[in-house]
Amino acid sequence: MHPAHLLVLLAVCVSLLGASDIPPLPLNLLQFGFMIECAIRNRQPALDFMNYGCYCGTVGHGTPVDDLDRCCKTRNECYAEAEKHGCYPSLTTYRWQCGRVGLHCNSKTQCEVFVCACDLAAAKCLAQEDYNPAHFNINTKARCR
């Protein structure tokens, strides 16, 4: 084997070892992102909601910074309620549709229905509120008490 091939192989192995420490995103978070984009009709990238305020994209604590952040707080509370019913919201994937008439859940199991309803309500809520760029990536330790 040529030395150049060995270097490439070594680089790939090292990068894979480093990537093993990065936890994968829950699948339903990806679904929720698509649901947000459907609800807001691509007005704002869904990733902009991942680190917004005190509750969007984090476990959440403190007082929400605005109504948009309250949407995420409500979703977190909905997820907590789903957990009380034996569901695992961050691991639960569900069936839904994005059509001309809007969003629609068409899941089968109790947990899928519950989690989809949480995400559906949150996506619709986010679509109704104004996005304030000043609340993106805030210092949550100082601001969210």
From Swiss-Prot:
CDD domains: PLA2c
GO MF annotation, one: phospholipid binding
Subcellular location: Secreted
Cystine bridges: 38-98, 54-144, 56-72, 71-125, 78-118, 87-111, 105-116
Region forming the signal peptide: 1-27
A cellular component annotation (GO) from this entry: extracellular region
Tissue-by-tissue expression: Expressed by the venom gland.
PROSITE patterns hit by this protein: PA2_ASP (PS00119)
Record keyword Signal present: yes
Alphabetic keyword roster: Disulfide bond, Secreted, Signal
Keyword NAD: no
Entries under Pfam families matching the protein: Phospholip_A2_1
InterPro entries in UniProt: PLipase_A2, PLipase_A2_Asp_AS, PLipase_A2_dom, PLipase_A2_dom_sf
GO biological processes: arachidonate secretion; lipid catabolic process; phospholipid metabolic process
Assembly notes: Heterotrimer of alpha, beta, and gamma chains; non-covalently linked.
PANTHER family: PHOSPHOLIPASE A2, PHOSPHOLIPASE A2 FAMILY MEMBER
Biological role: Heterotrimer: Snake venom phospholipase A2 (PLA2) heterotrimer that acts as a potent presynaptic neurotoxin by blocking synaptic transmission and synaptic vesicle recycling. May act by binding in a calcium-dependent fashion to neurotonal pentraxin-1 (NPTX1) and neurotonal pentraxin-2 (NPTX2), but not to neuronal pentraxin receptor (NPTXR). Also binds to taipoxin-associated calcium binding protein 49 (RCN2), a protein localized in the lumen of endoplasmic reticulum. Monomer (beta chain): Snake venom phospholipase A2 homolog that is neither toxic nor enzymatically active. Does not bind calcium.
Family per similarity comment: Belongs to the phospholipase A2 family. Group I subfamily. N49 sub-subfamily.
Protein name as annotated: Neutral phospholipase A2 paradoxin-like beta chain
Organism for this UniProt entry: Oxyuranus microlepidotus
